[in-house]
Amino acid sequence: VQALKRFVSKGGHFAISTGRGREFTRPLVEQLPVNFPCVIFNGGAIYDYSTEEYLMEIDLPAHSSEYIQEVMDRFPQIAVIAVDADHYFDIDGGAAEHYGDVYPNKSTVKAAMSDLKSKLMKGLMLLHPQWTEEFMAFVEEKKFPGVRFVPTSPHLIEMLPEHSSKGNALQKLMEKKKIQALTEQYLKLM
């Protein structure tokens, strides 16, 4: 952290690029000398914590809730967390009930899919690893338009906007801020 503070004090720009949402990234922003907009939601958004505003957002398609429902109908053993710009919604309480040991997020809000009215940024599918192959085969066969499914851990598959990525968002951020060069350092914080 001291090296980052020195870097920033000499005019460097430091940002975070993460799959987390705005409020789940905020504790990291408060711990580190972040002085530049951050890439969040796996590249689905760029958020400036200094002005508290989104500079870019890529939402899931409007009909993505139908995709989630179809996946839930086909795989009733999974739990789904639907994520909008502000909240993580534990659909029907399945994550807390069945996957609390692998996704112990206490900040989720229990909701039904039909209750969600806001645009979604991503969907998190929690499942036991033995279902991953069958799940991925199902979504690949369905070819849901406008989204992609990415396994990100043994118990988690994320549904993301088709063209969002951290790399694409970093490119957009560089263009917006007229940055000519970028370096990336992976930093794992506990």
Spell out what each predicted region is.
Residues 2-96:
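Active-site phosphate-binding/coordination module
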